[in-house]
Amino acid sequence: YIDPVKAEEERNRGNTLYKEGDFPGSVQAYTESIKRNPSDPRGYTNRASAYTKLAALPEALKDANEAINVDPKFVKAYIRKCNVLFSMKEFTKALEAAQTASDIDSESEGGAQHQREIQGLLNKCMNALYAQRSDETDEQTLERAMRDPEVAGIMQDPVMQSILQQAQSNPAALQDHMKNPGIRAKIQKLVAAGIIRTR
């Protein structure tokens, strides 16, 4: 039953139906394409896009994650995941997906292909996070952020505590720490959570 040629035919048929606005029809075509070639991540990201149009966001997220499982280097899967999470108003998680997309894109063969689109997504996520927080006090932001176990863990990490203390007296020090990928990911998480203010 596996047949990459048939899979591509169905995927193209799905794309045509999608452009015509027949999203349920495109979901069926993409589903057939996935059955014919489950190792091609494009079927999943295409179907995720159609599900998003149908407001079936949990299904769309599942497909975006499945595309990432099939091919962890497929940048468009992370872009799709970011868009789905944004639609779900999960702005912090959407921001993380966009950051992962950016990292994978810049490491990809042939150089970065999607940086403009990804930069747009990063800005969109940050603006949404700022808007969400604009009517919160610092205490409320901290309280909300600390409900995320990952944020709480970072805040209790002695290395991060000393970096944050250092950054209060010398903000430029953060830039140096950003060169370390492990620390950078933690700093980005705190920025996204609103604990580190960038404006």
Task: Please state what every model-predicted region is.
Residues Y1-R199:
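Alpha-helical tetratricopeptide repeat
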